[in-house]
Amino acid sequence: MSGELNGNDTSAQAAVSAGSVLEGAAFADEGEQHNESMKTLVLGALGVVYGDIGTSPIYAFREALHAAATNGILARSDILGVVSLIFWALTLVVTVKYVLFVLRADNNGEGGILSLMALVRGALKGRPDLILGVGICGAALFFGDAVITPAISVLSAMEGLEIVAPNLTPFVVPATVVILVTLFSVQKLGTGRVAIVFGPIMALWFVALGASGLWHIFDDPTVMAALNPYYAVRFLTVSPAVAFVTVGAVFLAMTGAEALYADLGHFGRKPIVRAWLWIVFPCLLLNYFGQAAFILSHGEAAALPFFQMIPSFALWPMVLLATAATVIASQAVITGAYSVARQAVQLNILPRLEIQHTSEKLHGQIYIPRVNLLLGLAVVILVLGFEKSSNLAAAYGIAVTGNMLVTTVLLYIVMTRIWNWRVSRALPIILGFLVIDMLFFSANIIKVHEGGWASIGIATVLVLIMWTWVRGTRHLFQKTRKAEVPLDLIVEQMAKRPPTIVPGTAVFLTGDPKSAPTALMHSLKHYKVLHENNVILTVVTASKPWVASADRARVSQYNERFMLVTLTFGYMQQPNIPRALGLCRRLGWKFDIMTTSFFLSRRSLKASVHSGMPLWQDKLFILLARTASDATEYFQIPTGRVVEIGTQVNI
């Protein structure tokens, strides 16, 4: 689309006008921000949000052409049909669905599948388990995507070596593994120092995409006719069977679109949309149309068109730039996996995980060792198992299309329950999105035997883990509650017949403030003493990402010995109990960490035949509970102030 850069033809003016209309529609309710700040955010969005979709041209068009070829032969109509499908898919799915609609469905500024789930659960209280199940499936598919993205991205970039130096072909897989192992190994150091260059590198990458595509559009300018949807429709109808398979490959051009919503909280809607409309979208289109024009004039180039259309003098720089871009894309996905894992822990979908902060200034920069290890192992195994990016392509589409399908379903609930749209207004839009999503999903699901099993397998395992944890914690709560004593009764008894009173404050953590904490009961049973001040502490996770400090703590006094404190954190916030309790000073309780002891109960779980869950699920839940991060570390309580009391529970 040369006109979109030089502005010399009517198609360029139409594109600019369309961009203005779309941007106006997207920002109708937002005020202007400072230009310099906006430029910085747009540049940052290029480095984080668009790495995945920005590296798709390396392999997406190639895979679509391979699928469209009949007996290895491509007709002109096939090439125009494929590039037309890519253009309209990017327009309808990314520009219309995500930019105009999904990005508006923020949960107090945050995006992502779990944020959307939490938003919908708050609005649709009648069927919380159904929405939870949908959210779990979406999160599992996201993690599946997080495994495949680094593998296919870096592998596809390294395959450029086959063009630069064919004798290096045997080293493609080993070099990919070395890069990925290095990438995962340095995660614990944090990305703050290097992330500053992500934006400029990706900006250079998009310029290279656009320039190389624009240059080759002049090989056959008639390729611009593919902007007409006629070519896409004709391709779909002339040979439906071939077209159906090709649609699954065309979807590779959109992998990474979900990142627009997932990273909403990092940059805000306006920078993400501007980066897409004015930089990413035009450059992607120029490259795809350039590849199509190059193949129309060089029919033998369908093997690796992205690299084959690069001049020989620029091949090495392009391979290096592509490698850097795919590493950045992988880093963005890894960071996203940490963020989703933290949300899942806070929403009690996963057991507690050790979370390390890698920046003193930016709380969002975190490192989760267990997620990093498992993700890294899975990525390396995929690379060694599939060996070529074309083999991984089948596995890639299922995870992303499934995630997009879940997003569409939840978006309908947001439209009707939160935006208060009439069904007659929301349903036609959602049905349109569902038709497109189902087309892409069904075209990818048939590739199970070609590699799609990997994506489904990863998602299935994660769904089992998350649902087992949710079900197990509920079952454990119900079982222990039956054996617990009401807190009101204990408080009343202690007032009538108080045991020996010792100085200081005791804080008892509990998930059920109506029942006496197990640690309190065992303390009374074994030590037969009661502290001067006893705090029954409950930590609650809100259905919104952030809770202000002013709303963090609620304090209610039972009597002179007992008080109930509830601390509320957003699902994007890391609980810090001592710091939060310090806020209680303004509520009348002068918290002093040096005179306070924290009593925690550590449960030893044993599987039971009559637990209410299958035995295998009992054992899996027990394993997950044993691997959970220590509560002392997770809640950031000083170890010297903690007393742990062990109990055994049969589940």
UniProtKB/Swiss-Prot annotation:
The keyword Protease does not apply. It is a multi-pass membrane protein. One of its GO terms (cellular component) is plasma membrane. Keywords: Cell inner membrane, Cell membrane, Ion transport, Membrane, Potassium, Potassium transport, Symport, Transmembrane, Transmembrane helix, Transport. It catalyses: K(+)(in) + H(+)(in) = K(+)(out) + H(+)(out). The chain crosses the membrane at residues 41-61, 82-102, 130-150, 163-183, 194-214, 235-255, 276-296, 309-329, 366-386, 395-415, 426-446, 450-470. Pfam families: K_trans (PF02705), K_trans_C (PF22776). One of its GO terms (molecular function) is symporter activity. It comes from the Bacteria. InterPro entries: K+_transporter, K_trans_C, K_trans_N, Kup. Its main location: membrane. It is found in: Cell inner membrane. Belongs to the HAK/KUP transporter (TC 2.A.72) family. Transport of potassium into the cell. Likely operates as a K(+):H(+) symporter. HAMAP family: Kup. This is Probable potassium transport system protein Kup. It comes from Brucella melitensis biotype 1 (strain ATCC 23456 / CCUG 17765 / NCTC 10094 / 16M). The gene is kup.
